[in-house]
Amino acid sequence: MGDLFPGSMVIATDLSPIQPVDVPPNVHFYVDDSADLWDFAHKFDYIHTRSTVGCWASFQSQIAEQAFDALEPGGWFESQEVDGNVCCDDDTLDPTGPVSAWFNDLLVASEHVQRPAILGATLKEVYEKVGFVDIHQRTVKMPIGGWARDARLKEVGYMWEANLLDGLGGFSYQLFNRAFNRTPAEIELCLVDVRQHLGDPRTHAYMPGFIVWGRKPYPGEVSGAAVEGK
């Protein structure tokens, strides 16, 4: 973004100092918790969040309302989320199998620790409640594995499967221990079956994705206008 818009200032935050050092001079990374009070000295024209499912007790109060306040009138807020539930349109996913069981555990555990794994499906409503206007929503399907006929979706599916496999432990260990008091050995035993079944090409599973963006109204502008997209 810094290279594409050299006249802009790009600020990004993360909980850990994991970002690259070699960046354009107008890009700045800060170690910060976005759930804390935002104390930026200036307003923004564009604020963006992505893949924050499970991070917030309340996306509305901790993020969306702060983003609204931090934007200039006419500025845009955009969120991209893939929710933590698994879907299937043709009954090829076993509802009692290890993949379905793991996703169900993820949803239950995330609610137990008050960090919901369902966020994307609520974004548009949150934007409306906060007061954004000209709200748009696009929904996408993130295939798990290479089962899709479309070449692009097939490639996305392979990458998404690899992403899930790489993150299974990180998604599971602390969450399942805190919610269910499971030991690392018990969790790993469960994950063996999940890894074996996750990319089965006979299973046409996917995860729902949501892209929502809206504009902070100008003074005197009516709020709540929304546009549905695909």
Q: Positions of the model-derived regions?
A:
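Conserved SAM-binding strand-loop segment of SAM-dependent methyltransferases
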Residues: P25-D36
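A short acidic, Gly/Pro-enriched loop at the edge of an enzyme's catalytic core
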Residues: A35-I47
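Conserved SAM-binding motif I beta-strand of class I
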Residues: M9-D14
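A short glycine-rich, Lys/Arg-flanked "PGG" loop and its adjoining helix->strand segment in the class I
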Residues: Q60-W76
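Conserved SAM-binding loop of SAM-dependent methyltransferases across substrates and taxa
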Residues: M1-P6
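C-terminal lobe and adjacent flexible extensions of AdoMet/dcAdoMet transferase-like proteins
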Residues: V130-K230
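Conserved catalytic/acceptor-binding region of the Class I
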Residues: W76-G170
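Residues lining the SAM
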Residues: Y46-V53, Q80
